[in-house]
Amino acid sequence: MGLVLFGDVVGSRRDSVGSTAWLRELVAELDSAYGSERLAPFGFTQGDELQGLLAPEADPLTAVLHAALGSAGRRMRWVFVRGEIDEDSTGNAPATERTGSAFVVARDAIEDARTGRERLVILTGRPGVDSLLADLAPALVDMLDGLTDRQRLVARLAMLEDLRQSEVADRLHVRRATISVSFNRARVRPLQRLVAGIRLVYSSGSVDPGRAATEATTATEPEPIVAGQADGGVQQ
């Protein structure tokens, strides 16, 4: 099992050289951000399509946020698919050379996303979870697209470096009141809540349905009554 990701720069043909340079920087950033969760090095194709292969429990939004909140952030189209992957006989093949059913699904999904002008598709293999993620994804894309350069910087410090408002103010050498205004304009708090919600929904897709049903049944079963306690007392 693995988490396959495909991403391409929206409108990359208008600046293919710039898009390629930016993707190269993003690949290095994501390799570092995911660390041991990578099952293969990130890479990108000549068509400016980024590909990655991560552990199934990895957080897809890490890639989305790193791309969207960078200083030269470009609009991306993302597809994430959790599913089966083939073994790597070499042990060091990059994601662009890996195969498996999850890659096939991801290829079809990103083509559909281009046709439907979708920007973020996350597929866990559980229809109920995937449907809810499809409802939430456009809201995240809209919020990220609406940020100015300054707001992206503030959001990046808060969401990727986990800094408090006071720490962001210190980092940027501005008054805390100024950062408070920036937080409000960037809608950092609502953005954090939305990201947390999507992460929660996504993580629910990793729970085995059979195991979840068993745990739910166990949790709702009444506790057995110990002999002598039926009337609220204990026999001596």
Describe each model-derived feature in a short phrase.
Residues 1-216, 220-236:
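Regulatory and interdomain segments flanking nucleotide-handling catalytic cores
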